[in-house]
Amino acid sequence: MDKDAIESSIIIDLFKEEYKLDFEALNLQWIKKYFRVEEEDRKILESPQSYVIDRGGQIFFAINDGKAIGTAAMVLVEERIFELSKMAVEPKFQGFGIGRRIIDECIKFAKQHEAHEIFLITNDKLLPALELYRSSGFELDENYDDNRY
């Protein structure tokens, strides 16, 4: 695939009901590959409108030829604090800068909503994602302890 052609054909769109199944499928693909699907995953993936949008967050989609090939959610955790969550890019489209474009839109959204903190929770198994997050300005919090994972 031609990287320039792919990059120029991608549009970033906001959550629509028609993308709901794509949000779930894109995320289940990587979650099942590396981990197990947790109850919290199921809630957000099956009901993104109520768990993200209705609570003041947003879900972004990378669209190529009318198909959702990438996604990420900005979840409002508490006033002015957002979590970047449920980020996924279709494997055959990874490495084309799509994840970066989605993250950039997520950060822009948080800034527009006067966020004073954006965080994400990830796993060191996801090396390409870790590098993407670091290069997007995220920093490792050595003191953070999440015993869910």
Regions found by a protein language model. Give the residues of each.
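Conserved GNAT acetyl-CoA-binding A-motif
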Residues: 110-122
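Conserved catalytic-core motifs of GNAT/GCN5-like acyltransferases
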Residues: 119-124, 130, 134-149
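Basic/polar N-terminal segments that are highly enriched at the extreme N-terminus
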Residues: 1-8
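Active-site acidic-Proline motif in GNAT/NAT acetyltransferases
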Residues: 90-92, 96, 124-125
